[in-house]
Swiss-Prot record:
Its EC number is 1.17.7.3. [4Fe-4S] cluster binds at residues 268, 271, 303, 310. Keywords: 4Fe-4S, Iron, Iron-sulfur, Isoprene biosynthesis, Metal-binding, Oxidoreductase. This is 4-hydroxy-3-methylbut-2-en-1-yl diphosphate synthase (flavodoxin). It comes from Anoxybacillus flavithermus (strain DSM 21510 / WK1). Its cofactor is [4Fe-4S] cluster. The keyword NAD does not apply. Converts 2C-methyl-D-erythritol 2,4-cyclodiphosphate (ME-2,4cPP) into 1-hydroxy-2-methyl-2-(E)-butenyl 4-diphosphate. Belongs to the IspG family. Pathway: Isoprenoid biosynthesis; isopentenyl diphosphate biosynthesis via DXP pathway; isopentenyl diphosphate from 1-deoxy-D-xylulose 5-phosphate: step 5/6. It comes from the Bacteria.
Length: 364
């Protein structure tokens, strides 16, 4: 399968210790659901997100209590912190002063140009990038008056208008998002944006829904955009524990070969030929490999029909039979294992393979 081609002219923008854009990998983001002023709860959730693979985290900043909490939160986390600003530009100024690694502003509600200018000046002084967050649900009145309703052209026009304001102030540390809850609108907007400017694009389908429906909707929209080589960072928006957002984002990137050092599971859908408890085995292995930092493909297969063929495509795998399983490695049978020890034996082989990849990496 051919590799996805990324836009080579995307500008790199530094966010804390991570660079978005350029030739860098697509970065996974999420957003906390805690009250930001509750520092302990917010930090605890961010630590869970970090553990799940979140690389950049965003917090809401609806009031001064939240802005005042930024400094303490920053001290206690290890990943870059983005502060989300709506309506009151003064909160952006305070967040920047307190150590935010990036600011997200919505052009539709931040206010007059001079307020944006004040935020840009503060960000420039501290080397803090700004994400221009265009949202189909909150476009400026002049855009809606011109187009009649949210359109991809209107969203891109809004983004370009605010990009020019920042550029006029000699500010180029810009990241742009063009989010919509309508999947087709979002796809069109991101496609047009990718042709209109070379700033990094933050991908997202906003208000996508619950864990199940939102995952499907996000995968459809974000997958279509990523498949075109568009996008430098991604946030899957779900009405769920934000850790689930990170899990979905990781799987989505893995599906397109965009997640380095991540293990992938393939498992069969099961049928009447299955003689082992494949579903529980697959779930356990999926959870186990979530923390494996090696590009390993693991197969959990239920019978001899597709098992051997699929196993050849995997680095390591198991093909089940009645009461036992065949352990495969790089398409070759390693040994038979009884069903009761099948999972533990597979885990051992996964660990061995991960160690081999790690040692190869150290030797380079």
């Amino acid at each position: 399968m051919s590799e996805i081609i990324h836009r080579s002219k995307t500008r790199p923008v530094r966010v804390g210790n991570i660079t978005i854009g350029g030739n860098n990998e697509v970065v996974i983001q999420s957003m906390t659901t805690t009250k930001t002023h509750d520092v302990d709860a917010t930090v605890a959730q961010i630590h869970r997100l970090e553990e799940a693979g979140c690389q950049i985290v965003r917090v809401a900043c609806p009031d001064e209590r939240a802005a005042d909490a930024i400094a303490e939160i920053k001290k206690r986390i290890n990943i870059p912190l983005v502060v989300d600003i709506h309506f009151d530009y003064r909160l952006a100024l305070k967040a920047i002063e307190n150590g935010a690694d990036k600011i997200r502003i919505n052009p539709g509600n931040i206010g007059k140009r001079e307020k944006v200018e004040a935020v840009v000046k503060a960000a420039k002084e501290r080397g803090v990038p700004i994400r221009i967050g265009v949202n189909a649900g909150s476009l400026e009145k002049r855009i809606l008056d011109k187009y009649g309703y949210p359109t991809a052209d209107g969203m891109v026009e809004s983004a370009l208008h605010h990009i020019r304001i920042l550029e006029d102030l000699d500010f180029q540390d810009i990241i742009v998002s063009l989010k919509a809850s309508d999947v087709r609108l979002a796809i069109e907007a991101y496609e047009k944006a990718a042709r209109a400017f070379d700033y990094p694009l933050h991908l997202g389908i906003t208000e996508s829904g619950t864990l199940f429906a939102g995952t499907v909707k996000s995968a459809a929209g974000l997958g279509a955009i990523l498949s075109k080589g568009i996008g430098n960072t991604v946030r899957v928006s779900l009405s769920a524990d934000p850790v689930e957002e990170v899990k979905v984002a990781r799987e989505l990137l893995k599906a397109f070969g965009l997640a380095a050092n991540a293990a992938t599971l393939i498992s069969c859908p099961t049928c009447g030929r299955i003689e082992i408890d494949l579903i529980s085995i697959a779930n356990e292995i999926e959870e186990y490999i979530a923390q494996i930092k090696a590009p390993i493909k693991v197969a959990v297969l239920g019978c001899a029909v597709n098992g051997p063929g699929e196993a050849r495509e995997a680095d390591i795998g198991i093909a089940g039979a009645r009461g036992e399983g065949l352990l495969f490695r790089h398409g070759k049978i390693v040994r038979k294992v009884p069903e009761e020890t099948m999972v533990e034996e597979l885990k051992k082989e996964i660990d061995k393979l991960a160690e081999e990849y790690a040692s190869k990496g150290k030797q380079k």
